[in-house]
Amino acid sequence: MRSQWVAKRRGQSNVSQMHYARQGMITEEMDYVAKRENLPPDLIRQEVARGRMIIPANINHLNLEPMAIGIASKCKVNANIGASPNSSNLEEEVAKLNLAVKYGADTVMDLSTGGGDLDTIRTAIINASPVPIGTVPIYQAVESVHGNIEKLTPDDFLHIIEKHAQQGVDYMTIHAGLLIEYLPLVRSRLTGIVSRGGGIIAKWMLHHHKQNPLYTHFDEIIEIFKKYDVSFSLGDSLRPGCTHDASDEAQLSELKTLGQLTRRAWEHDVQVMVEGPGHVPMDQIEFNVKKQMEECSEAPFYVLGPLVTDIAPGYDHITSAIGAAMAGWYGTAMLCYVTPKEHLGLPDAEDVRNGLIAYKIAAHAADIARQRPGARDRDDELSKARYNFDWNRQFELSLDPDRAREYHDETLPADIYKTAEFCSMCGPKFCPMQTKVDADALTELEKFLAEQKNKEAIAH
């Protein structure tokens, strides 16, 4: 779809959506996003120019269907996939991608850490994906030196980052905000550093006693991103790994640096979103969102959860969807899903499904709470279908039609029950929605009540 769009841009020194937006241009991607979001094209351009919205759209990802991440657009959901040293299969990863897209993922991150040819897997995912693909290039950098983190050089990082950009990756998590002087701040934490990328950078700095190479070479990463229109997803290496550690000095120190890096990227017209926690008690979620907006000049916020309690392994798609809905309500632009397998193991297809649906619920609930135009239309349509006992229409409008139909048909599988005025919960005689109050009956009732009121007034 985008071949002709990007052909005229090739060879330019900066091909980012922000660059064109700041020149007053409405690109084809901006126009496409405007139609998807039901927003004016110039509003999209203004938000991208301002940095409050990004359109992750690498010029080499030609089959991408452009989408937006930002406060003015609908709340988005990301799903993670990826091969590991213990589980790696190209066909499986493409199947996971297709499953994620089926259940509503707005973007997908390939977090492959080994076990196969990572370049082949990544390229296959990009070629098959209509949604933006994100990566964490530091994982492949570590794999390239067989896990010997201390052997990595700044050039190794830059080489892998450019390779991902050439392959068509739309956004990359770059852990540039973790400075060496912040490491002592984790001493009082219960769970230390829980970011994989952050842990890698921390280990490198502790070995070499040198500053974070992603920070010292940030301008070189900017130059790579300008050439391909890759968006920064600035990684929160010091995100809290438990509610005890939430909103501590380590987390907030890094956040301040992420804000500085955001503005540095903007000076070169490169798009940025900022990653956030993690594990956060409900009473601290609003503070975390507002603090990010303040420190990062309202760059889109992209949070993992957050989990609001730590005691429910096996149910962390629920503990985190609670926090995600609140974060979305307060202004977070994208939610990274958490599956029931979080903290326990590698998610399978059913885990991906359950995690995604939980997060689509959270994002949609946030859109309703933020009173986005049209956000509740689907809810109203489903409610009408429910009141009219139009079961097939209810299934069709559901976030997970297959699951809704499956649960209904467990007890009433025959087609005749698709028009029945009851389900197995109340049976044929006790469903309250059978009580249809027509307009004439209400008019008669209102007339009666008015007469009663008049009689009482006369009596007094």
Curated annotation (Swiss-Prot):
**Annotated positions binding substrate:** N80, M109, Y139, H175, S195, R196, G197, D236, S237, L238, R239, E275, Y302
EC number(s) stated in the UniProt entry for this protein: 4.1.99.17
One Pfam entry name: ThiC_Rad_SAM
Keyword flag Membrane = no
The entry's free-text remark on the cofactor is: Binds 1 [4Fe-4S] cluster per subunit. The cluster is coordinated with 3 cysteines and an exchangeable S-adenosyl-L-methionine.
Q: Which reaction does it catalyse?
A: 5-amino-1-(5-phospho-beta-D-ribosyl)imidazole + S-adenosyl-L-methionine = 4-amino-2-methyl-5-(phosphooxymethyl)pyrimidine + CO + 5'-deoxyadenosine + formate + L-methionine + 3 H(+)
Give an example GO biological process. Answer: thiamine diphosphate biosynthetic process
Detail which positions bind Zn(2+).
Answer: H279, H343
Residues annotated as binding [4Fe-4S] cluster are: C423, C426, C431
Keywords, A to Z, come to: 4Fe-4S, Iron, Iron-sulfur, Lyase, Metal-binding, S-adenosyl-L-methionine, Thiamine biosynthesis, Zinc
Q: Which GO terms describe its cellular component?
A: cytosol
| NCBIfam families, per the entry | PRK09284.1, PRK13352.1, thiC
Name of protein: Phosphomethylpyrimidine synthase
Q: Which organism does this sequence originate in? A: Rippkaea orientalis (strain PCC 8801 / RF-1) (Cyanothece sp. (strain PCC 8801))
